[in-house]
């Protein structure tokens, strides 16, 4: 066999890192000797093991898809999870903790619409449920992926997201048995079964709380806030240089349940109303209404500062939405059908998540030091520089000779 299995996997992974969002783009430069040598060095196959007289090439997409059709998703998933576990163990993700709990956002995403196979009435739409560690700096590192069983209707998809969540949290718990986790999600997950799971595992939760999801509990929380006039205060947000800025009002209440029965799950609700200050052309300041929302949580809320922190972390659920947007429109190819085979498709999706994780760490830890004096360069420009470097220069240094101090000093 010309290529090792590691080389085949690295060909796909490097394609995602270099934002090649289709298989044709991955294959367009496969005859480049510098790129081929880089892939061989990354995979550990080594150029010296290449057959004499054979031209250096990168594996084509059909070759690595042929390998991934036989499976490999558990091994790739383990690599994704181990990367995040390593960062947590080395205390590089302390910024992703709220009161000691690592904050994990959960949300479903449409992976792709697969090509309609022969004999099928319609094309299969594939969904995934993502668990991503989020942080105030915009970080959203994929930690675990659970497959959502396909349904044709949107309501069926939502039902399956909850079923996938129950499967996913068990596996996250198995991967991180002693890690305190705070689950952040949208209003779909603000229900008694999810809260009961968090209680059984000793986890915390901050979930978007909307009237349409639980009208009775929403009305109970709103009435309780109107009665408890003392449980309100100023909404405090972090401005530039982490300065505290008064930005609206916040209120909270406790003892809210989805059912009138005593055995129902009791939780706290925090509501906020943000006021945005804008400067007019004449220099005067005006206040405009900003974000308004409510969050269900099992954190103890005692004052307006704690309530403001709950609101801030609840709103950071948008980190995972932003990461999906980057994967869709930033060159990764999310929602693009790479392969009709579901095993290969799942493996490629996990490699995409691993590539995005690697890029986020690189962007947060390495680029700020390299980009001094080039602060206006976007990520797309840096990807283009990397792409040209791989094609023109490649990887020349021996990995064993790289100084470890650069890795130790990385801090998210």
Outline where the language-model segments fall:
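Conserved, well-structured functional cores that handle cations and Mg-NTP chemistry
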Residues: 1-206
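Short, charged, low-complexity patches
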Residues: 158-162, 307, 347, 351
């Amino acid at each position: 066999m010309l290529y090792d299995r590691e080389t085949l996997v690295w060909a796909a992974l490097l394609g995602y890192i270099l934002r090649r969002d289709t298989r044709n783009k991955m294959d367009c430069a496969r005859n480049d000797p510098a790129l081929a040598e880089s892939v061989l060095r990354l995979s550990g196959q080594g150029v010296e093991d290449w057959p004499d007289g054979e031209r250096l090439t990168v594996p084509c997409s059909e070759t690595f898809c042929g390998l991934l059709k036989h499976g490999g998703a558990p091994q790739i998933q383990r690599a994704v999870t181990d990367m995040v576990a390593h960062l947590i163990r080395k205390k590089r993700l302390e910024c992703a903790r709220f009161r000691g709990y690592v904050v994990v956002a959960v949300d479903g995403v449409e992976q792709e619409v697969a090509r309609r196979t022969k004999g099928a009435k319609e094309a299969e739409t594939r969904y995934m449920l993502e668990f991503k560690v989020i942080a105030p700096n915009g970080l959203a590192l994929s930690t675990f992926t659970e497959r959502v069983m396909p349904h044709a209707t949107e309501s069926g998809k939502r039902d399956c997201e909850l079923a996938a969540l129950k499967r996913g949290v068990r596996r996250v718990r198995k991967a991180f048995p002693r890690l305190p986790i705070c689950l952040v999600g949208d209003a779909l997950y603000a229900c008694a079964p999810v809260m009961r799971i968090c209680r059984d595992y000793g986890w915390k939760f901050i979930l978007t709380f909307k009237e349409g999801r639980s009208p009775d509990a929403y009305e109970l929380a709103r009435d309780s806030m109107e009665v408890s006039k003392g449980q309100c205060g100023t909404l405090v947000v972090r401005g530039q240089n982490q300065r505290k800025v008064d930005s609206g009002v916040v209120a909270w209440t406790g003892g809210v349940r989805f059912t009138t029965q005593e055995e129902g799950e009791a939780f706290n609700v925090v509501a906020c109303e943000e006021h945005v200050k804008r400067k007019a052309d004449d220099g005067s300041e005006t206040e405009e209404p900003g974000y308004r929302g409510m969050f269900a949580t099992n954190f103890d809320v005692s004052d307006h500062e704690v309530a403001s922190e709950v609101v801030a972390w609840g709103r950071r659920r948008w980190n995972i939405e932003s990461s999906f947007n980057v994967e869709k429109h930033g060159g990764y190819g999310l929602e693009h059908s790479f392969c009709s085979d579901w095993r290969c498709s799942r493996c490629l999706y996990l490699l995409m998540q691993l590539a995005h994780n690697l890029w986020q760490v690189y962007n947060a830890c390495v680029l700020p030091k390299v980009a001094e004096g080039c602060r206006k360069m976007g990520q797309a420009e840096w990807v283009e520089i990397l792409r040209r470097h791989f094609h023109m220069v490649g990887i020349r240094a021996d990995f064993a000779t790289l100084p470890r101090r650069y890795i130790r000093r990385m801090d998210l």
